[in-house]
Amino acid sequence: MNLFKIEAGTAQHIGNRPRQNDRVAVLTGARAPGYVLALLSDGLNGPAGAEQVLHTAKQIFDGFKPGDGPNPERLAQLLRDIVEETHLVIKMNAVTTGEEAHASFVGLLLSPHGEAVWAHVGDSRLYRFEEGEPVLRTNDEAYIEHLIGLDKLSVEAARNHRRSKLLLNVLGNSRKEPFVTVGWQMGMAPGDQFLLCSDGLWHFFTDAELGAALARSTPRQASEMLIAKAAERSQGKGGNCSMVIVKLVKPVQP
């Protein structure tokens, strides 16, 4: 018996930028029936890094064969493997091209056992809602604590990490390995909703506004409304705006 049905959609808008550097996808695994992988990556200074995220993720996910029961630790490792492999490939490509591509990463993996596992690197975000109410939003706090605890940075320097090329937490940074923050929730059920988005979207909304948009509309309707509102609030000065919306709904009874 299916615990839920998945409704998902992706949407993008170029904003006032000359090109779209974000990439989004919703994938199913070739050897993992019932598993769904949602991805969002924001390419810095071009789309190459974000494109590599999607390419590597598909390769790894297609080779993934799950066990018989819930195993969130294994799903989390799959997401870490995607980050590590993509980071390595981007760095190898930089040796050939002479240009270093960077990209953020947000991944959400849903299993038919009711597991939701997510991972992120950089300033793209994942939100989780229950019936439209915000319950979780990814942030930089774990990375900041890592910089203070292991790298012995001051609190001020750690919190300003985005301004430093040395400390920039992205895939492809030759100066620093990506710091992956992972989380999961068991017992997913109809009414649970997720939003993966780039900073071109989350910058213009409160958590409550995003949750309300997802709760009252289909993924397509919600994404169209959010893109239109982001363009309005940015006054034509917004950047690339991208999102993946995933909603768990009641399965249709036969």
Write out the residue ranges for each language-model feature.
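PP2C/PPM-type serine/threonine phosphatase catalytic domain
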Residues: 1-254
